[in-house]
Amino acid sequence: MAPPRYLLMNSIWTAVAAVLMGGALAASQDDGSASPAETWPPNPERIALLPPVEFNLEEDTFSSEPIADADPKAGTPQRRRGGSPFGAAAPVSLGGFWAPPTDVVGQPATLGMNAQFARVAAPLVPPKEGEPLWIGIGRFGRLELSTDAILPDSQQPMPDQLWLVETGLTHIRPLARGGTLGGTFLFGSASDRPFAAGRDLTLMAIGFWNTPAANERDEWNFSLFYSPTSQLPYPLPGVAYAWRPSDALEAKLGVPASIEWRPDEKWTLSAAYFPLVNVAVEARRRLGNDWALLAFYRTDTQIYFLADRLIDAERLYVFDQRAAVGLERAIGSGFTVEALASWLFDRELFQGTNFTSGRTDSVEFDPGLGLSLQLLWRR
C-alpha cells in the first residue's frame, strides 16, 4: 500500500483537475452564444511538423517544462493533435539547478545539490505534412550530491555524482483514416558510473495509437509504457479519452491524465498525472508578447542504478515535492530563457526494488530553496 503522503499527492491531482474542469465548463456555459469554432484561440488546427516528443515523465531534469506547447512568437497557444499521449516539451533545452545544503535527518551532515542537463530532439529527415516522421533524441544529466552523509543500512558513502546519458528515436506515422501510430525507444545508462556494467543500462520504450472518436472532435489514446528506471518498473498500459469540448479546454481522461484550460488569451491552467505519484499543476500568465509568469506544484523523482549495489534489481530514488514561481523571457528566433525559484520539501533518498515498499538506506533531509535557469528552443 502506498504511504499516506503519496495518496495525498494523487488527491491533489484529482481535486485540481475537478476544479479546472468545472471552471472551464461553467465559463463555456456562460458564453453560450459561442460555438467551439468561435472560441479562443483562433486557428487552433495549425499543423505541427515537429510534434511533441518528450516522454520523460519521471526523470525530469530538475526544472519545469510548460505542459502547453506554446510558441513564444505566436499570439496564442496552439492545440496539440497527433503526437504522443505523454506530453510536450521544447525540442532543445539546457540549463542548471542549485539547492544549498540543508541538514540530513538523524545524521551530523548536510546535503546540497547541483545539476546540469541538456536535451535535443530533431527530425532525422526534413518533415513533410502528412508523412511519417523520424526524430532523433539525446539526453544528458548530471546530479552532484555534496554531503558527508552515508547510506544508513549498507553503511556505504553517499554517491557524489549521478549521471543520465540516453539516446534514441521517436517515430510518428499518420494513418489514412485519421489518427497516428508511433513509438519511442531510448537506450542509455542512469548510474553513478554510467555504462560500467550491463546491469547499469536502462531503456524506455513507448508505443502509442491515437484514433479519432465518433464525433471526430475528440480522440482515443492507447499506449504502452515501460522503463526499468520508473516508479512502476513494469509494462504499463494506458487508455485515455482526449475530450475537447471547446478550443479553450482539453482534458485527457484516463491514464496518462491531464487537463489544460485557457480561460482567455493570457492565462493557461493545467494539471497532469502519471502513475504512481507523478503530479504537476501549473498556472501561466502571459505578460505581453515576450514575458510570462508561471507558478507550479509538482513531484520530482530521479531514479538510478548504483554500480556497487548488492541486489541487481535495486534502484536509488531521489524524491521531493516542490512549489515554484518564475519568469520566462522570449529572446527571439524561438529561444526562451526561464528562471525559477522553488521551495523543496518532503525530500528523501532511498534504495529499493520499487517505489513503495522494500526500502533500505532511507535518508531524509530538510526542506530548502532551489534555483534553476534554463535556455529552451521551441521552434
Residue ranges and their predicted role:
Residues 97-101, 139-145, 188-192, 227-231, ...:
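Structural signature of outer-membrane beta-barrel domains
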Residues 238-242, 325-335, 341, 362-379:
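Outer-membrane beta-barrel "beta-signal"
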